[in-house]
Design a protein with these regions (language model features):
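Short, low-complexity, Pro/Ser/Thr/Gly-rich segments in the mature regions of secreted, periplasmic
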Residues: 110-125
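Bacterial N-terminal signal peptides that target proteins for export
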Residues: 1-11
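SH3/SH3-like beta-barrel superfamily modules
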Residues: 28, 37, 73-113
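N-terminal start and proteolytic maturation junction detector
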Residues: 13-16, 50, 103
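N-terminal secretory signal peptides
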Residues: 26-75, 85
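Short acidic, gly/pro-rich beta-turn/loop elements at beta-sheet edges
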Residues: 71, 105, 118-120
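C-terminal segment of classical bacterial N-terminal signal peptides
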Residues: 15-24
């Protein structure tokens, strides 16, 4: 099974759980309910940035900008394209990944060091 099919399966499972009301965040520690994109510590980019995953290994998604808050089984792989909405000063980015095959998407936080800016999303001003 290819990395993209595994990711598609994981994203599909996450979407099904979300639609059934089973929040991915339901059993996370209270520290995982911290900073959200647009908060003082993570100002929004306007327009959002287009980013590409770099490196050779997969990048874990987190429910909050905290290493103790992984979203189990949700990750992206090198060369995947993300929309980056915000970034903290301590190296976290609020992102969304849209699977080009299924159209499913997932949002969360990833380590900024693994992203390369590829432009902006939206109209040029």
């Amino acid at each position: 099974m290819s990395d993209k099919s595994i990711l598609a399966s994981i994203l599909c499972s996450a979407m099904i759980l979300g639609s059934l009301g089973a929040s991915v965040h339901a059993q996370t520690p209270s520290s995982c309910k911290g900073t959200h994109a647009g908060a003082k510590g993570a100002p929004l980019f306007s327009p959002p940035l287009a980013s590409v995953v770099t490196g050779t290994r997969r990048v874990q998604f987190y429910s909050a900008p905290n290493l103790h808050c992984p979203i189990n089984g949700v990750f992206v792989v090198p060369k995947d394209e993300l929309v980056t909405y915000a970034q903290t000063r301590d190296g976290w980015s609020s992102v969304m990944y849209a699977n080009p095959t299924t159209g499913n998407n997932v949002s969360g936080w990833v380590r900024s060091a693994r992203l390369k800016q590829a432009g902006t999303v939206g109209p040029k001003q």
